[in-house]
Regions:
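C-terminal accessory/regulatory regions appended to core domains
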Residues: 1-170
C-alpha cells in the first residue's frame, strides 16, 4: 500500500497547504532518494529508489494542483467522484457548459475571443477553487466538495479544448 501523500511530503492533511513548504519538502526528499545517489548500490536498492522517486513525484504532482489535491482528499475520506450518487450536474452549470462549448465552436478561429473566453473561465475556476476550503472543514460538507471538484474537472477539460483551439490558430 502506498503512503499517504501528505505524510510522505511532510505537510498537514488539509485542502489549504503552503505550496512553498510542499516544494521545499519535495526537493529535500528527492535529494535523499534520487536514483543517482544509489548508482553504486545493488539492483534491489536501485529499484527501491526508482519506486520511491516515482511515488514522491506522484505525491508532489497531486498535492500541488488544487483540483488533484481535492480529489485525493476526497479519496482519503473514502469518497469516489464517479459514484453514481454524485454524478448529477446542477442545471445552471450544465447550461454554462453548453454555452462555453457553443462559444468555443462558434469562435474557434478567433484568437482574441478564445483568449477572453479562457480568461473568463480561469476566473470562474479560481472562484470555485476558493470555495473548496470551507467544504473540507466538515465531513457533512464533503458532498459539496465532490460537486465542485467534478465541475472543476470539466472546466480543466474546457481550458484544454480552448488551448488546443488556440494552437490550431497558430
Amino acid at each position: 500500500m502506498s503512503q499517504n501523500f501528505f505524510k510522505l511530503l511532510q505537510i498537514p492533511e488539509a485542502f489549504v497547504i503552503d505550496i512553498e513548504t510542499l516544494h521545499q519538502n519535495y526537493q529535500s526528499i528527492q535529494k535523499e532518494i534520487h536514483p543517482d545517489r544509489f548508482a553504486s548500490f545493488n539492483q534491489e536498492a536501485k529499484m527501491e529508489s526508482v519506486k520511491k522517486t516515482a511515488q514522491v513525484n506522484d505525491a508532489y504532482q497531486t498535492l500541488k494542483s488544487p483540483i488533484r489535491r481535492a480529489e485525493y482528499l476526497l479519496e482519503l475520506h473514502g469518497l469516489n467522484l464517479h459514484d453514481e450518487k454524485y454524478t448529477a450536474v446542477p442545471q445552471d452549470f450544465l447550461m454554462q457548459q453548453m454555452e462555453w462549448r457553443e462559444e468555443l465552436e462558434t469562435h474557434k478561429d478567433n484568437k482574441s475571443y478564445l483568449e477572453k473566453l479562457a480568461h473568463d473561465i480561469a476566473i470562474k475556476k479560481d472562484e470555485m477553487i476558493n470555495l473548496l476550503p470551507r467544504y473540507f472543514e466538515k465531513k457533512e460538507m464533503l458532498p459539496e466538495a465532490i460537486k465542485i471538484t467534478r465541475e472543476l474537472n470539466f472546466i480543466e477539460k474546457m481550458e484544454q479544448h480552448i488551448h488546443d483551439a488556440l494552437i490550431e490558430i497558430h
